[in-house]
Amino acid sequence: MLKESSRTDRKEDEMPGDDKDIEACTSRCLDCYRSCLQTTSQHCLEAGGAHVEPGHFRLMLACAEICRTAAHTMLVGIEQHGRICAACAEICRACAESCAGLDGMSECEEACKRCAQACERMA
């Protein structure tokens, strides 16, 4: 009779970070995804000016998407999530910096910083 292998028995399923760290990082990524996407659509578009400057606006959209992707890779449990998290941290840092000089962006800026810190621990 074949032994049923559990997820923890298989080498290819090992991921950096323990379950608590992964859960915390996933939560931070989803928070940042939500914050960036809502802020672009509900604040930046309304505010106009520097808030919709192409470089800033594209960075916020990219940040939202990489955060969603990082959360997805951790939720599905692939071992390569650390590389996605490293890219996520880099983009989140850039997004936080871009948001820092604009009014009404402090919540998004802080969400990006928290996500970057969590992702750096996973990378």
Annotate each language-model stretch with its function.
Residues 2-123:
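Amphipathic alpha-helical hairpins
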